[in-house]
């Protein structure tokens, strides 16, 4: 629904002029401009300036603005997350490579991946990637956090922050919370192929796992993945944290505002932030959001943009900064290093003709790709059915070797045959099919993610221009163990697909195809088709000392060498958790907000007893 131009006072500072809120359709998304009438952010000073309006920022904005004496500003480059494609889980098919709500980023050319660039989906809206991800809610395992080896961040330390943040709809349940803002629930879409997949997985020896977030038992097994949804609607942090706080007079949100630099003054007592420079358009004026005395800048731009902006502001490896003519404020070699992700591959099989209609897309579209009114009605009146799913909320966590202490593989099961072995491109190809009036074929897809990959990449500078994307070296398979994991993953997926009762539905394997039979064949297939699981972390890692590559202190998330500057987003995670990273990002933000407000740490009340 389009909104006409109007003036509102939502979020206006008491005594300030009302904000103009003009809505217009841009690239299929409603763009909502929220800003002070006197200028993009006005002339007032802020206690907290949040750079980026993504997953962590929305949490912080809510929690910090709860103190009416603190003025909080959020700067977000993209639009709001109000678009229908964001709210409806099935709208994910329209969000990949979206011209407005995605950053459109790719890695540098990867020689080891047959000279391919890897597309990296990054949400560009209020809510960030929590508004464009698969809505899967996974914390990883207790062992993931214990492996960090950081005081205050063990599994015992973080567990109650996970529970505090959560509002689990199907509770009460052990290891889950019901009083938080982060809505979670069990999937609200069922397909006969889900049960057949479970039976086939059981036939290979996998156990059933009733709750992948219950740390009282191992992560292994097959089952439903809990989702970040509320009654079938996406529950990103924009909806669950930021929107409920928007009426507060001490909170200001500016969209279409791209941060270009953190302003840092160097003095005799050291370096300190004074504010943030930003632009409303690439070649337009630059504005400054100024800090009040004692104020802080909180970097919440994610694992790509946070290190990028730190380097542009003089915080990073001195050699890199000097190469691009940037004055060095704090020589931190770890900025942009330690990039980690979940590399993914696909196994897909086409259904026999009599079972073509079992795919999730066949429940939404007819043979000519016209949307079915029944699916729409089911969603509108029940908030259930194929529109209530991103397609991959059932699956398994598996160990590809008996020597492993915990799963290294996540299988995401999709009732439908992938159109391209690059899982992301399947959605783009589907868009072309829709234009031609052709449907997505029936069958199954198993997206296979190396969830505890060892390879590490980096974020660097291409230029000292904030509007030129950084150099992203994703560096998959720099550790050959990750390639071996995915080779074994394809073999395990084939084993499951060959079991009854799943086997009876399938006609032929389309990807990688039966001709890819040897390990060498599978390695070649994976190098040509591996894609991102969109779980980037680690590029401003927390730790005890910059000498060990840390960028921020694990004690308080402060950037080493700069006063008034902290990082609160997925880039601080020193090692990637074995599951989707949204839950861990919210956990970090909840804890950071409590730290900033001087609130006591929650005393751990649960003891994880298994990995």
UniProtKB/Swiss-Prot annotation:
InterPro entries: FAD/NAD-bd_sf, GMC_OxRdtase, GMC_OxRdtase_N, GMC_OxRtase_C. One of its GO terms (cellular component) is membrane. Residues 1-22 are annotated as: Disordered. Its cofactor is FAD. It is found in: Plastid, Chloroplast. The keyword Nucleus does not apply. PROSITE patterns: GMC_OXRED_2. It comes from the Eukaryota. Hexadecanoate binds at residues 392, 412, 427, 447. It catalyses: a long-chain fatty acid + hnu + H(+) = a long-chain alkane + CO2; hnu + hexadecanoate + H(+) = pentadecane + CO2. FAD binds at residues 55-56, 76, 125, 129, 133-136, 582. Optimum pH is 8.5 (with palmitate as substrate). Binds 1 FAD per subunit. GO terms for molecular function: choline dehydrogenase activity; flavin adenine dinucleotide binding; lyase activity. Keywords: Chloroplast, FAD, Flavoprotein, Lyase, Plastid, Transit peptide. PANTHER family: CHOLINE DEHYDROGENASE, MITOCHONDRIAL (PTHR11552:SF147), GLUCOSE-METHANOL-CHOLINE GMC OXIDOREDUCTASE (PTHR11552). Catalyzes the decarboxylation of free fatty acids to n-alkanes or n-alkenes in response to blue light. Substrate preference is toward fatty acids with C17 or C18 chains. Saturated fatty acids are converted to alkanes, not alkenes. The decarboxylation is initiated through electron abstraction from the fatty acid by the photo-excited FAD. Belongs to the GMC oxidoreductase family. This is Fatty acid photodecarboxylase, chloroplastic. The gene is FAP.
